């Protein structure tokens, strides 16, 4: 049962505030009339060392491409991100200077965090949980089965093959901010027609009968670069990515949005139908 939940941006008024959520944590503690010493587990939403492994292996696999991106990412990781537990302890002491129980701090795999947030508040004792996003540590799409108080991941699709990153690539192409403006791309879709759907299927993503997929990395930069797409992607659609400061949204962009929206929905439906057939679980 969820007792309290809050987003830091609601307190700071900073959209997508990525700082330690001091105000949100303090709110849920106050709301539930608890102190840190009363809490059994404090869980961080991903495993930093696994994510760091993915970054290193990706840069090695794509080398010498991506050196600029690599050189920008490494100082941040070596200075801060590899020491999340220490950082969390320091921040938690702002709520209670006497708190020192590091054993209470746990790290959950990113997609397991998503699955738990969907399954445990649900009315189901058993369900299939399908998670699809940009990328967690390695996983971009996972299938899990939840039974009562247990969760088990059954299948994974790994980076760089990602439906979320494909959608973000089109977010970038149409001139919206990645990891922020995806909802704008979705909102644009009903105003267009999916005339580029087959071009996406034929060039960018190979979808298997069970809904699993591979992305053609010849068209993307996100694995190691500083942008989502490359010139080959732009050439495929006959336009460069829209500059939101100089270019208005045209019917072309609406049709692009409609096309990637249909592709995304079709792949998700294909995945769900395949999983329903394989696992014989009615709840999703």
Whereabouts are the PLM-identified features?
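Short acidic/glycine-rich loops and adjacent helix/strand connectors
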Residues: 1-284
């Amino acid at each position: 049962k969820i007792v309290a939940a809050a987003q830091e941006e609601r307190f700071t008024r900073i959209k997508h505030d990525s700082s330690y959520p001091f105000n949100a944590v303090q709110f849920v503690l106050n709301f539930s009339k608890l102190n840190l010493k009363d809490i059994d587990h404090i869980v961080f939403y991903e495993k930093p060392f696994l994510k760091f492994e993915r970054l290193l292996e990706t840069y090695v696999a794509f080398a010498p491409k991506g050196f600029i991106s690599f050189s920008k990412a490494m100082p941040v990781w070596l200075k801060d991100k590899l020491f999340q537990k220490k950082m969390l302890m320091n921040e938690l002491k702002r709520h209670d200077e006497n708190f020192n129980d590091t054993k209470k701090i746990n790290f959950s795999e990113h997609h397991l965090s998503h699955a738990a947030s969907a399954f445990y508040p649900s009315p189901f004792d058993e369900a299939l949980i399908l998670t699809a996003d940009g990328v967690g540590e390695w996983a971009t799409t996972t299938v899990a089965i939840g039974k009562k108080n247990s969760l088990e991941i059954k299948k994974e699709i790994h980076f760089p093959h990602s439906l979320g990153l494909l959608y973000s690539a089109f977010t970038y192409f149409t001139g919206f901010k990645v990891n922020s403006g995806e909802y704008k791309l979705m909102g644009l879709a009903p105003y267009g027609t999916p005339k580029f759907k087959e071009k996406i299927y034929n060039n960018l993503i190979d979808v298997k009968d069970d809904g699993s997929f591979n992305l053609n990395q010849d068209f993307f930069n996100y694995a190691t670069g500083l942008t989502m797409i490359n010139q080959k992607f732009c050439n495929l659609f006959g336009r460069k990515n829209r500059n939101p400061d100089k270019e208005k949204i045209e019917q072309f962009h609406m049709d692009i949005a409609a096309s990637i929206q249909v592709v995304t929905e079709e792949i998700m439906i294909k995945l769900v139908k395949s999983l329903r057939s394989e696992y014989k679980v009615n709840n999703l």
